[in-house]
């Protein structure tokens, strides 16, 4: 049996069924990474409209857009997007509680020991503030502040700002 596919068996056409964000992002990614010898077609229903709930992403969208050579400023402007520093969970744990899961780094490692190890030990002793208090993104979100990460100073806490 021949394990090498013959030219007639080679896939040359790709059909993506379903539009929306997932369909169009898939089509964009495949068209970027596959050679021009592939035909990519997206099929979406005219009967199914836009959901209209707003789109939300996580920080990995920056890597995705970068892989597609999309300029972040232009992307945000043309999509009328905004920046998100984290996700807030209202009534988290019990009514009245809220928790912001800030994107980016939480706390600062001390030597070879990760921050969360110190926090956990202090938390077990009843001496730690809530974990999100150690997130620069959470503080910024609570005070309606935003800036991009300072990438030229890797040891600065401002280098750890994560956003979407």
At which residue positions do the language-model features occur?
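Basic/polar N-terminal segments that are highly enriched at the extreme N-terminus
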Residues: 1-9
């Amino acid at each position: 049996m021949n394990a090498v596919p013959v030219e007639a068996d080679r896939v040359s056409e790709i059909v993506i069924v379903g539009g929306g964000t997932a369909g169009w992002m898939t089509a964009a990614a495949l068209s970027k990474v596959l050679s021009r010898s592939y035909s990519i077609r997206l099929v979406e229903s005219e009967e199914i409209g836009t959901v209209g709930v707003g789109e939300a992403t996580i920080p990995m969208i920056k890597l995705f857009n970068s892989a597609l050579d999309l300029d972040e400023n232009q992307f945000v402007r043309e999509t009328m997007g905004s920046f998100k520093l984290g996700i807030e969970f209202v009534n988290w744990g019990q009514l009245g509680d809220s928790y912001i899961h800030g994107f980016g780094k939480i706390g600062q490692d001390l030597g070879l020991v990760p921050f969360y190890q110190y926090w956990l030990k202090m938390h077990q002793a009843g001496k730690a503030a809530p974990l999100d208090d150690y997130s620069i993104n959470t503080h910024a979100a609570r005070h309606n502040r935003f800036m991009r990460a300072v990438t030229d100073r890797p040891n600065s806490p401002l280098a750890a700002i994560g956003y979407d």
